[in-house]
């Protein structure tokens, strides 16, 4: 877009640019650009904050509106003592108010619901096996 022309090699590069243009100091932006899926992003984020010696008490979780529940579940698992504020972004024209009005919206939301059960169930099994 005109506001963020890029080019960006990673999602992290784009989001860093957004934050810097909004006045966030560069030293406040932590780098995690190795994850390729949501749960891995939560894992890597935890590694980054632990390596920096940060205790995260409250965090804002920015994600696509239809993806918020699953992202929150993963981050709550990795940061059990953190209070999360979910900031859903309407993307692809899909919001909490209109998702059911199009086939694409319904497919995305129902697919997320399915993954909340199937993926999270598998993650929890592995999580408890480690204990």
Task: Identify what each model region corresponds to.
Residues 96-131:
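A structured, mid-to-C-terminal "fold-capping" secondary-structure block
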Residues 1-101:
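A structural signal for short, hydrophobic/glycine-enriched beta-strand patches
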């Amino acid at each position: 877009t005109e506001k963020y022309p890029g080019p960006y090699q990673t999602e992290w590069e784009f989001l860093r640019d957004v934050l810097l243009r909004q006045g966030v100091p560069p030293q406040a932006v932590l780098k995690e650009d190795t994850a390729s899926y949501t749960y891995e992003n939560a894992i890597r984020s935890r590694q980054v904050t632990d390596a920096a010696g940060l205790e995260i008490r409250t965090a804002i979780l920015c994600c696509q509106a239809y993806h918020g529940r699953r992202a929150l579940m993963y981050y709550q698992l990795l940061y059990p003592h953190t209070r999360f504020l979910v900031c859903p972004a309407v993307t692809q024209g899909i919001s909490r108010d209109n998702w059911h009005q199009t086939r694409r919206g319904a497919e995305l939301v129902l697919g997320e619901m399915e993954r909340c059960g199937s993926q999270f169930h598998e993650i929890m099994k592995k999580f408890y096996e480690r204990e």
